[in-house]
Amino acid sequence: MEKDTGTTHRRHRPGLRALPSGVALGHLKAASEASELQRSRSLGGLQPEGDPPSRPRKPHKELESEDQGKDPSSNAEDASCQKNLAQDKKESFSTLGKLGHESGKQDPEREKSDLEASMQEVQEGEHADGGLQEAKEQEAESIKLNDLQEEEKASVFVEIDLGDHAEEVVTDAKKEEKPSQMDVEDLSEDEMQTSWVCCIPYSTRKRAKEST
């Protein structure tokens, strides 16, 4: 198609030599514009039916003008977003710094408390060890005393003579028998007196009273 249109234009063109220079240039411009229009129409007609028609391309200047018109608002939004991000970062850093400072303050206190607790544990362990040692010493002393007492008892039983012991037992028995005999004699005399008094007849008593 393009070749045909070119040939037709060439056929209708008059010779450049016959026309003046100004007319020839104007004719060439018109011919070029007409050829471009025909090409655009031919390209638009050759597009497939299913595909949508291609959008006409905007000139570069119009795109630049649109971009320039959109730039101020977008730039303002970008700047505000950047400011917000910077503020968020500052706040996060400040909070982290505060937490670190507080943790730094708390760490010495924790260390002090840990040291005190460890010292108390050590002291308690020492007291417990001392108590165990004292208990062991007391047990050893008690065992020694028991052994000594048992040895003394065994030696006493061994040193006693049977003869002396028998004599002591006999003397003790004699001493016990003497007071018992005395008691029996006293009782017999009392009983005799009472019995003799009781045996006096009643008439003799009256006579004794009258004689007095």
From Swiss-Prot:
Biased amino acid composition, Basic and acidic residues: 61-70, 99-115, 124-144, 168-180
Region listing for Disordered, in residue ranges: 1-148, 168-190
Bias-annotated ranges (Polar residues): 71-85
Protein name as it appears in the record: Uncharacterized protein C13orf46
The species this protein was found in: Homo sapiens
